[in-house]
Amino acid sequence: MKKLSSALLVAALSVAMVLPVFAAPSPQATAKPSVAVTTTTTKAAPTAAEAKATEAKANATVAVAGADVKVLPVAVMDAVEDVVENTTHLKNLGVSSAAKLAAAFDLKIEIPAGQTSVSVPIKVNNAKVGDYAVILHRRADGQWEKVGEGFLGADMTVTGTFTSFSPVAIMVVDAAQASAAGVKAPKTGEF
């Protein structure tokens, strides 16, 4: 009798264990797309108060005499983040890997008639004397270029020579890291 009850118990438990599998919904097979799909993440548009606070922060970060300085749209800010967070891009531009983004803004100034470029001194308010600043400019073709660099003096300015105006990113290397990171003085080539 023990053997019979054991066999019935084993059979009942075996059936009981299998039944939930039949009750579960069948997994859906997903078809692979025939073309590559690129996805992008989008950021929510800032509220009016956030936009005003961001613009005030940008104006407090840099000062450009006689220029129109505006906060960058989200899509352009994403492009700024892509270049400043990619060490290969920075290396190709001749920017130290120790550089940190200090400011990003859209710069508009009229280039005087008959001139192909204009030098613009930019005051960097969120750095300190002795820090090394680099000005990056996004050209119309979407590529970034270095348009100015130098150690910040008492006036806290670095000058860039622009042939066109559009998004600008200011990268700063802390004074203590400048020589350790291999930052050379642009005119003398010295560390």
Label for each model-derived stretch:
Residues 1-11:
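Positively charged n-region of N-terminal signal peptides that target proteins for export
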Residues 6, 15-31, 183-191:
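Sec-dependent signal peptide cleavage junction
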Residues 23-64:
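Low-complexity, acidic Ser/Thr/Pro-rich repeat tracts that form intrinsically disordered stalk/linker regions
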Residues 26-29, 90-134, 139:
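Proteolytic processing hotspots in large secreted/extracellular or virion-associated proteins
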Residues 50-113:
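Self-processing/autoproteolytic domain segments and adjacent N-terminal interaction modules in large
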Residues 107, 146-154:
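Solvent-exposed serine/threonine-rich low-complexity stretches and specific carbohydrate-binding patches
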Residues 132-143, 167-171:
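Short beta-strand segments and strand-loop junctions that repeat across beta-rich extracellular domains
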Residues 159-182:
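C-terminal beta-strand-rich structural cap/linker in extracellular carbohydrate-active enzymes
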